Every structure is written in structure tokens, then in C-alpha cells.
Amino acid sequence: MKHYSIQPANLEFNAEGTPVSRDFDDVYFSNDNGLEETRYVFLGGNQLEVRFPEHPHPLFVVAESGFGTGLNFLTLWQAFDQFREAHPQARLQRLHFISFEKFPLTRADLALAHQHWPELAPWAEQLQAQWPMPLPGCHRLLLDEGRVTLDLWFGDINELTSQLDDSLNQKVDAWFLDGFAPAKNPDMWTQNLFNAMARLARPGGTLATFTSAGFVRRGLQEAGFTMQKRKGFGRKREMLCGVMEQTLPLPCSAPWFNRTGSSKREAAIIGGGIASALLSLALLRRGWQVTLYCADEAPALGASGNRQGALYPLLSKHDEALNRFFSNAFTFARRFYDQLPVKFDHDWCGVTQLGWDEKSQHKIAQMLSMDLPAELAVAVEANAVEQITGVATNCSGITYPQGGWLCPAELTRNVLELAQQQGLQIYYQYQLQNLSRKDDCWLLNFAGDQQATHSVVVLANGHQISRFSQTSTLPVYSVAGQVSHIPTTPELAELKQVLCYDGYLTPQNPANQHHCIGASYHRGSEDTAYSEDDQQQNRQRLIDCFPQAQWAKEVDVSDKEARCGVRCATRDHLPMVGNVPDYEATLVEYASLAEQKDEAVSAPVFDDLFMFAALGSRGLCSAPLCAEILAAQMSDEPIPMDASTLAALNPNRLWVRKLLKGKAVKAG
């Protein structure tokens, strides 16, 4: 998937105040009564008022072909709220709305369009507050405390539907086939789209559309829908409705990256850091019963225990998967943290990454050539760095205006407290020694002869993840590092943004008048003892990068305040999130994968055993989206990521890539 900045909608508002597309010469909604038309065509055409109370699942999934102003979504959300108020004991508790938009409105145009419908204001304001920046791919918005999920896919729907992960197949309960009229936008109304709609529709799923065009009806019938005409809204004579009355065979293009969930809703999580905390919250929101086992006497004593950590994306012109994942993970993280109902020290002050030498300058120049939205990243010249950061560096760079810093330790502790209020059970000082299958469950053996049995297990215990027989062959490694805590000075107190160079320096935390500077890097080490060498090196790297800056030379590390931790990392800098792969079975079953791709079956994994690991140094950026991805996978719900990027997070990816090329695979 090519990475590019999405072009915003080119529109104007007519005399009635209705938005009109200049490119397609068509209105976004009816000049007469767009709200009532939406209720009639899409809610009525899919019989949602009748289906909601009878729905046999806790989640109802709606997909839409053109988001536009969000009128259909807001109207549905309003109706869903009214349903929940009238039927609080119904099986259906959550709404998932998936929509595609090639030319998203700007936030300003969106707000202007929403003024048409004052009765939708309570819902429209929440949508506007989380409106994503124009990046391609999926933007997941968690609304109404997680009861409503909106997946906004920015890009061409005919391209995007071919790039969706198999987790979306046969998941859609109702389709809203909307968009500009077929005569105005023929490129959207294709057989390719109709086939994708059929593939994604659940057996018994429905569709509705405002048009009655013959080629649309015939195309949907060819795809597998049973179609019928219905009286149109207002002056329109007819519209179309359909139902998927059959179960279509599903294609599988890359079985080696298949993801399996679990029919069970009870899980144990092994860990105690940010990954465990955020995954607990995501599973609880989906109705899981969750137990957390932490080896330490308190949470966040491992890699998640730092006072300050920087939040900004990891970008690379030469690695599309890394680029796509981290840009969308970053924007999701900001939305997630902003709406999280817990307190934690943070400041979205911005992050500036500086080119202190020729190599770093070249890397930044490559990042800036990717046509990124200004909301995500902008170039900053050397003479402007002092103005935006508060300190002189004599370097140019790239600024992430929505980045900043937060306290990982406080975040982790308070998220776990919130999760406990929602039913999470936590056991501290439970060191997992081994785990094994027993009667379709997992038997967990802890130090001190403690045992527990759980239906599903998630390993989220950082660098200790490879200590079990099921995970000992994973290609992950430990990285020990030391962060120095330095007292502020009059010059350092002027620092307004996080600085990244051959290290990083945070603005002072008002809670303690200290900065964090770091971090040392010792690959393969798990040593957490204080190191005076590391303390001095943290200071020296700052001086070496900014040799003309007097403020850098005045950094004082003499009080020996520091924190040492160990991270878990991978060679490709991407997390490992998904099923725990079975190494031995993979080598056997995929021995001839390079020659027999067409005969491949799903990759071997351990049943009901999952992992959430290798967050490296960017866990604050990646953990929220990874938690959402894994919780969705475990619950057999739509995953907010395209197939190729999701494959790059699969724990078996490094083995499979070699096997596909006919190369030998080694453990670790």
C-alpha cells in the first residue's frame, strides 16, 4: 500500500447550506430532508428498528460505502442510543460502524455540515472531537465509552476492500450502499465493490441503497444478494434492498498469516506493564472475564515504569508496513489517551527530531519527502528550532506537533485501577514458570507451587516472554537501558518540547522539576543495575549532538538519579501481536512452502494462546492500537488494520518470510 497524504473533499455550500462536491457535482445529502431520507433508506431499508431487539449477538456491524458528512452514522448512532435506552437488557450492547471515504471532509467543513441537524449535535460533537487527520488506512474511533466503534477507512473503496484482512469476512450485518449518484461517480459503483460487499456480509445480512439503477441491482444479484425494489423516499420512485441468503465460499490469499480468535470469553494475562493494562481494558469492554498475573509486587516495575516517555511516530520512507503502522498507531494513541478517564502526568507539547549529523539529516529529509499531513509532521529550519523548542541547537529537523510526553508508570497504574473497577482480578507476585494444555484449557504453574487454570492466556510480560517452551524460539531480544533523571536549570526550564537526537530529552515534569534524558542501549542484556558509565554517556551524547549549546554542557547527572529497565525488541522494530506460533509444527508443515504456496493451510499456532510483545522503545505509541487489534482478534471482531500491515505484526512473520523464499529458519 503506497503511503500518501489523503486529499480532502473539494466542496462548497449551496444557497440552502447543503454541501456540494465540486468534483462530482452532487450534494452530500438531500436539500429537502436528508435526515429523514437516511432514516427511511438506510435504517428502514435494513429493518434495524426490528432487528436490534432480536439480534443474537452483543455486537451489530454496519458497513457503508461513503462516509461523507457522517449523516448516516450519526443518525444510526442516535437510533442505537434510543434502542439501548428502551431495551437495556437486550443481548445487543455495542455498535460497530465501518465506512470508506476517498475524500474526507476537513474538521471545519464537517462541523459546518453538522449545523444542519441540531438534534444530532450530542453525537456530532463527539465525532468532530475525534476526527482523524488525513492519513490512508483505517482510523478507529472509540465513542460513547467504547459502546460505539467507528472504523473510518480513508482511500478508494475499490482498492481498500481488496486489502482488508480476513477478519472482516462475513461480519457485516447491514450494508449502507451510499455515495454520489452512479451517474456522477461511476468509478465507485463497480462489480468489484458488489463482490466485496457480498464477501463481507454475514449470512442473513442485508443492504439498502437509495438508487434503483438496473446495473446496480444486477451487479448485487450477481455477487450473491437477493434483491428487491422498495418505494423510494419522497419524490424518488424506487430504491433497492437486499439480503444475503446464502453462505459464500471465502477466499484465503495468505493462510500463513491467518489469525484465529477464541469462542471463549475468559482469559489470563501474564504481565504488569502498559500492554497488560490496555489489553485488560479492551477485553473488558468486549465482555471478557479477565485475570492478570504480575510477577512483581506492584504494576509498572518493568519497562513501563519510567517517569516520562516520548510519544511520536516511527517513520521510514523505505518500510511501508512500519510507516503505515506507526502513523496510524500514533493518531489512535492520541485519541485514546485524550478520552481515557484516568489521570496521568502528560503534556502534548510536541516532539522535535533533530538532524545533528549528515546521516540523521538525510533520514529526516527522506521522511519529509513522503507528503505527510502537516498535522502529523512538518519540517523545521535551524533558526526556528529555538523558537518552538525553547533552546538553541543549531540543527534543523522534523516536528510532530501532536506529540509530547507522558508518565508511563502513572498511566499503567491508573488504567489497571480503572480495569479493576470494571471487573479485572489482579494477583501480584505470581511468577509464571511454565504453562501446558489440560482439558481444553491452559494450566499455569507459578513459583511457590501455585497453579491456575484458564481458558485463554495472553503473554504480555515483556522481555521475559521467551522463557516458556512455547515461546523460546521467538526471534525477539532484550535491550537493557538506563534513563537519567536530571534536575532542571534556568536554561533547561525553557525547554518546551521533547528533543530527539542520538537520545532524547524531555521538558521538566512540573510534578518533580526533573527532566528525563536517555537512554543507554545494551542489546542482549537484562542487567538493571545502576551504571555510572551509562549516566555519563547519556549526558555526553547530548553534548556531542549539540557541541555549541552551553545549556547541554550544564546538564548535571552527579546525583546518580536514574532508572534502569529492559525492553523486548525485534529486528524489524515492529511489535509481535497475535497467536503464539508453533515453531516445530511450522517447520514441518511449511517445509515446502516456497514450492507449494497454493496448497498451504493456516499456519500452526497454539490454541487459545496469544502474545502482545516486542514494543521496543515505542510502546507508548504502539500499545493502544495493538491492544485494540489483539482484543478484536481474540473476540472474532473486525480488526482495524489492512492485511499487509497486519501481517507485519504477526509473530510468525520472520519465519514465514524465509520459508516463502525457500530459506532455512533458525530459532531465536
UniProtKB/Swiss-Prot annotation:
Q: Which GO terms describe its biological process?
A: methylation; tRNA wobble uridine modification
- Under which EC number(s) is this enzyme classified? 2.1.1.61, 1.5.-.-
Write out the catalysed reaction: 5-aminomethyl-2-thiouridine(34) in tRNA + S-adenosyl-L-methionine = 5-methylaminomethyl-2-thiouridine(34) in tRNA + S-adenosyl-L-homocysteine + H(+)
What's the cofactor? FAD
Q: Recite the UniProt keywords alphabetically.
A: Cytoplasm, FAD, Flavoprotein, Methyltransferase, Multifunctional enzyme, Oxidoreductase, S-adenosyl-L-methionine, Transferase, tRNA processing
Question: Cellular location of this protein?
Answer: Cytoplasm
Concerning InterPro entries, the annotation shows: FAD-dep_OxRdtase, FAD/NAD-bd_sf, MnmC-like_methylTransf, SAM-dependent_MTases_sf, tRNA_MAMT_biosynth_bifunc_MnmC, tRNA_MNMC2, tRNA_S-uridine_synth_MnmC_C
State the residue spans of region: FAD-dependent cmnm(5)s(2)U34 oxidoreductase: 270-668
GO MF, one example: tRNA (5-methylaminomethyl-2-thiouridylate)(34)-methyltransferase activity
- This protein's major location comes to cytoplasm
Which cellular component appears as one GO term in the record? cytoplasm
Q: Where is this region: tRNA (mnm(5)s(2)U34)-methyltransferase?
A: 1-245
Query: NCBIfam families, alphabetically?
Result: MnmC_Cterm, PRK01747.1-1, PRK01747.1-2, PRK01747.1-3, PRK01747.1-5, tRNA_MNMC2
**HAMAP family referenced in this protein's UniProt entry, alphabetically:** MnmC
Q: What family does the entry list? A: In the N-terminal section; belongs to the methyltransferase superfamily. tRNA (mnm(5)s(2)U34)-methyltransferase family. In the C-terminal section; belongs to the DAO family.
Task: Describe the task this protein carries out.
Answer: Catalyzes the last two steps in the biosynthesis of 5-methylaminomethyl-2-thiouridine (mnm(5)s(2)U) at the wobble position (U34) in tRNA. Catalyzes the FAD-dependent demodification of cmnm(5)s(2)U34 to nm(5)s(2)U34, followed by the transfer of a methyl group from S-adenosyl-L-methionine to nm(5)s(2)U34, to form mnm(5)s(2)U34.
Q: Which PANTHER family match?
A: SARCOSINE DEHYDROGENASE-RELATED (PTHR13847), TRNA 5-METHYLAMINOMETHYL-2-THIOURIDINE BIOSYNTHESIS BIFUNCTIONAL PROTEIN MNMC (PTHR13847:SF283)
Provide the protein name. tRNA 5-methylaminomethyl-2-thiouridine biosynthesis bifunctional protein MnmC
The species is Escherichia coli O9:H4 (strain HS)
